[in-house]
C-alpha cells in the first residue's frame, strides 16, 4: 500500500488534517494505528475506503474491508448477515475462522440480534478474514469483549496478516501487532515493533527534543545576557566620556 503526498481537509475547513503524507506499508503487516483522539485515525481509514476526495495518491494491491460492518436489519438470520457482508463467502472458510475464534457455527441460524455483542464481533471478524486478497481496517474491536474475549481475539489476530487496528487497549495492541502507524500533527509515520516499542522510542525522542529545546533556551539566555553586558559596558564608557568633559585645545598663536 503506497501513500504519496496525501493532503486532506474537510470541506469548508482551512486546516489540513493531513499534509503531504507519504509512506509505504506491506500488506502482510499487522499494524496498530495510534494518535490522540480527533487527530484523524478514522478519517484516514475512510480515505483508504474511498469515502472522501483528497489530493495525492493512495495505491493498493488489495481491497479494503472495514470492521465493524453495519448490519441494517438485525432481525435477519446471522447467515443472511454473513451473505450481506460477503456475498461470495465459502461456508467452510467461515466455519474454519469461527472455530479459531471459539464460536459455534450454530449461531449462524439464529437471528442476528439474538447474538451477544461479543458473538457479533467474532462472527464479523471470521467473515472478513475469510475474504481473499483483503486488507482489514479494524476499528475498536474490543468495545464489547470481556477479558477472556480480548485475549482470544488478540491471539487470533496474531495468527493473521494484513490489517490496520485502532484500539485504545494498549495491552491488546501489544499482543497482536508488529508495526505501528502513528499520527504526528498532520503527518503519519510507520515504525517497526509493537506499541511498547513505539512508546519507548517516542519517549526517547520526546526526551531528546526536550533536552535540545532546553539547550536552545539556555543558549538564547546566554546570548541575551552577553548582549546586555555589552550594552552595559557601552553605557558605562559613554558616561565616563561625559564626566571627563570636552578636551581643551590651546590656541596656537
List each language-model region with its residue ranges:
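ABC ATP-binding cassette signature C-motif
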Residues: 1-214
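Flexible nucleotide-interacting loop at or near the entrance of a catalytic core
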Residues: 1-10, 207-253
